[in-house]
């Protein structure tokens, strides 16, 4: 769906809405909206997209291994399930002082609030169950200025955080069980400030 468009010298709102259906072993959806409002002095935009998907991978393994003149038959069935959702957001505003000078402010965010992975393996050698939950988010804010006399200046800040939790259980053919839990994460904060001056000779 596309809203009304406008010529560059006009003021008005234009935009687009989209949606989709993904078919794999399991289904998923995606969709989004984009809007742009313009005046002779201002450009303001908004973009949002989301994507949800789930799928399964299945494998069966049959093999014969020889160890010390003995032949061992190995049969394993493996299932891997994945599902997760991603949100993407961007909004920005530009103000034009004149044809040669403007200032821009933009925000970008990416969010993965819940991504689940589950793998299960069962056979005559071992039975294993592995579950992982992950989440991540990223924020970026950028302010840029261009003067009419060749100076560029700006500030850019990025924040990123992720977490992962894993639970693993394994039982061998002698009924001996091992289990562990892990938690990991990462946090990044990054600043960038710049000033540049150029002259035309």
Predicted region positions:
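Extended amphipathic alpha-helical scaffold segments
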Residues: 118, 165-166
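Juxtamembrane helix-loop boundaries in multi-pass membrane proteins
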Residues: 127-131, 175-183
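Membrane-proximal, glycine/serine-rich, low-complexity loop/turn segments characteristic
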Residues: 1-119, 128-160, 196-201
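Beta-propeller domains
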Residues: 138, 168-169, 190-191
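DNA polymerase sliding clamps and clamp-related checkpoint/processivity subunits
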Residues: 161, 167-174, 183-185
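Short, conserved phosphate-binding/catalytic loop or strand-edge motifs used
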Residues: 122
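Solvent-exposed loop segments that connect transmembrane elements
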Residues: 66, 71, 169-178
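Outer-membrane beta-barrel transmembrane domain signature of Gram-negative proteins
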Residues: 181-201
């Amino acid at each position: 769906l596309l809203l009304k468009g406008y010529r560059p010298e006009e003021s008005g709102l234009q935009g687009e809405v989209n949606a989709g259906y993904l078919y794999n072993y399991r289904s998923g959806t995606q969709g989004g909206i984009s809007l742009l409002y313009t005046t002779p002095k201002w450009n303001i935009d908004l973009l949002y997209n989301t994507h949800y998907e789930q799928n399964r991978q299945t494998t069966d393994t049959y093999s014969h291994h020889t160890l010390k003149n003995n032949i061992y038959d190995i049969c394993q069935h493996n299932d891997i399930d994945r599902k997760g959702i991603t949100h993407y957001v961007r909004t920005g505003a530009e103000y034009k002082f004149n044809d040669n000078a403007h200032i821009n402010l933009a925000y970008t965010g990416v969010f993965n609030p819940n991504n689940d992975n589950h793998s299960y393996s069962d056979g005559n050698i071992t039975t294993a169950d592995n579950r992982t939950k992950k989440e991540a988010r990223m924020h970026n804010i950028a302010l840029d200025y261009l003067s009419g006399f060749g100076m560029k200046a700006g500030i850019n800040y990025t924040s990123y955080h992720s977490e992962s939790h894993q639970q693993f259980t394994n039982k061998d053919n002698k009924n001996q069980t091992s289990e562990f839990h892990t938690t990991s994460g990462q946090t990044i904060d990054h600043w960038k400030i710049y000033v540049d001056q150029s002259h035309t000779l």
